[in-house]
Structure formats: structure tokens, C-alpha cells
Amino acid sequence: MSKIVLDNVRKSYGGNIEVIKGVSLEIADGEFVVLVGPSGCGKSTLLRMIAGLESITSGTISIGERVVNNVEPAERDIAMVFQNYALYPHMTVRENLAYGLKNRKTPKEEIERRIAKAAKALEIEQFLERKPRQLSGGQRQRVAMGRAIVREPAAFLFDEPLSNLDAKLRVQMRVEIKRLQRSLGTTSVYVTHDQMEAMTMADRLVVLNAGHIEQVGTPIELYEKPASTFVATFIGSPSMNLLQSPESAAWQPGRAITLPSGGYTFGVRPEDIRILEEGDQDADGFNAQVRIEAVELVGAESYIHAALSDGKPLIFRVAGRSTHNIDEMVRVGASATDVHIFGADGRRVSD
């Protein structure tokens, strides 16, 4: 196991197109860190730089106590799990697991020990003599993970490994990956664009935007105190409602909100908004009259899509099956403690 340290890492193409913009990050020994962000934010490029598959333009990358800027990928003591499994189709599962170890001249007895240990942990013992074409997508992904595990590396690097799986299997596999990582205690860096994967798997999240870090923290820290409007809308589903401060009475802050000078944006998560009853005095953060435009039933709860009097959209959540009708007018509100305030630059200005 090893910590991974990135110090002011930059990556440019053609000398003037910078895609990684001075990223500094320390990943602790045994930590599971998830790099998350939209397409094109630089998360996969950053992972490939750690792996040695992409060169860096400036800065340093250390694995353990060793700077690995100029170290070949095979010598970095890392193992990578890819989206496309990367299995040899003509080999059995056992042969796929053993291939890398044989290339490193690992003794036969040690190879068998590692294969048996990984196969048991991944519950693929009954598939060892099968070839990849005889396996399901989930089973193939377990084999790909097994090939990484038998390496017994200093760190695991996961590049969107669940993207090819269906929704049910993704849920199962993310639980298995996290369980295995905890049992092995291996430092892990995991890339995904799926914020649900990120929230449920990470010890810490690193939210990337256009090649730089927007925020680093635990999933609950990023959810409850997003550092910017970008993080606020990226983390959480449905995303946080963001509304510019209006001059009209369509949507006004309540008495408990202290406003910063200059332009500002209010943020409220859908689950923090409730429909107000007559005489309700608890909505001291904001309250507004809205018109219901759509109702989505998603099992144990409903999402109501509404419009403010100035036409701006607002989404909020109610428990169970909503009894409200399209075009119905309702008053909604939230407590001051649930209102997030962001300045004109999009950065958080309130606790």
C-alpha cells in the first residue's frame, strides 16, 4: 500500500492547450478516492498520468516515496481496471489471471496462491476454466478485477469500470468493489462520471471541472456544503435549484437570510423544499408561489416540477404519491438553514 501525491501537475497538448491545470492532491495510504466530473473535465487524463500512460508537462507525481514522472507504467507498482475488461479471449480465466504474473517470473506456487485467493474473494472459482465469451458482463468485470488483485499492487486505478453494465449490476458491482477495497486496504483511485457511484463508493470525492479541482471532501461534505454552483448542481440528483436573486415578489428570501453585497445566487435542494400550509411560519429561508407543471412518481417519493411566477423552474420532492394536479398553484418554502448562498463568482459565501 502507498500514498499517491500530485504536486501542481499540468498537462498541455501542442504547447498551448492546457487540459490539466495545476492539480495538487494527496491520497492517503489505503484511501478510496473518486475523481468525478462531466465529460472533458480531465478525470481520465489525470488517471492515465498517474498510471504513466500519459506524460505530464510539469509538476510531480509520487507513489509511495518515489517520484514516478519518468518511470514506465509497468514499473509503477499499480494495477488498472478498464471499462472494456481487456481480457484475452483465447485464454481461460485462470490463464488471464496468471498472465501478468508469469511475465514477471513469479514462482508457479505463488501464482496459484494468488489466483486462489482472488477467485475466492471475487466468487469466480467455478469460472476459472472458462473463456471470457462464456461469461456474463458482470463475471468478466470480476475477472478484470481479479487480474488487478493478483498483482498485489501498491495502488488500484479504476477507469469507469462499470460503464458497460446494466443498472442493477452496477449497483451490485459497486458494493463488491468497495467491499474488496476495504478488505484489501489498497490505495485506490476511481474515475466515473456517475455521481451516484461517486457518492456511494468514495472515502473522498475530487470534483473536477475543466482541468482543475473544484472541491475535495467526503461525499456528505460536498453534498451539504458545496463550494461552488458547479459542485452544487453536479452532486445530487435531482440537482440543487439555483435561482438568481429577483427584484420582484416572485421569489423572495425570508427574514433570516443575510445577503452578500453584489450579485448572488440562492441554492435549495429539492428535498429541503416543502409545500406550506396556511399560516406556516417555519419557512424563514424563502417562500414562493409556484405553478405545478409535471409530477414524477419514482416509487417511495414524487418529484414535482414547478414554475415560479417569473417562469423560472423549481423542482421539489414530496413523500409518497403526490395528490397535486398539473397547473395547481401552491406555496412552497424552506428554512434558512437549508438555503445556500453563492456570490457573483459562483463560490459559496455562506455556511
From Swiss-Prot:
It is found in: Cell inner membrane. It is an enzyme of class 7 (translocase). The keyword Cell inner membrane applies. Disulfide bonds: none annotated. Its main location: membrane. ATP binds at residues 37-44. GO terms for biological process: carbohydrate transport; glycerophosphodiester transmembrane transport. It is a peripheral membrane protein. Its EC number is 7.6.2.10. InterPro entries: AAA+_ATPase (IPR003593), ABC_transporter-like_ATP-bd (IPR003439), ABC_transporter-like_CS (IPR017871), ABC_transpr_MalK-like (IPR015855), ABC_transpr_MalK/UgpC-like (IPR047641), Mo/tungstate-bd_C_term_dom (IPR008995), NA-bd_OB-fold (IPR012340), P-loop_NTPase (IPR027417). The keyword Translocase applies. SUPFAM superfamilies: MOP-like, P-loop containing nucleoside triphosphate hydrolases. One of its GO terms (cellular component) is ATP-binding cassette (ABC) transporter complex, substrate-binding subunit-containing. Belongs to the ABC transporter superfamily. sn-glycerol-3-phosphate importer (TC 3.A.1.1.3) family. Part of the ABC transporter complex UgpBAEC involved in sn-glycerol-3-phosphate (G3P) import. Responsible for energy coupling to the transport system. PANTHER family: MALTODEXTRIN IMPORT ATP-BINDING PROTEIN MSMX (PTHR43875), SN-GLYCEROL-3-PHOSPHATE IMPORT ATP-BINDING PROTEIN UGPC (PTHR43875:SF12). The complex is composed of two ATP-binding proteins (UgpC), two transmembrane proteins (UgpA and UgpE) and a solute-binding protein (UgpB). This is sn-glycerol-3-phosphate import ATP-binding protein UgpC. It comes from Brucella abortus biovar 1 (strain 9-941).
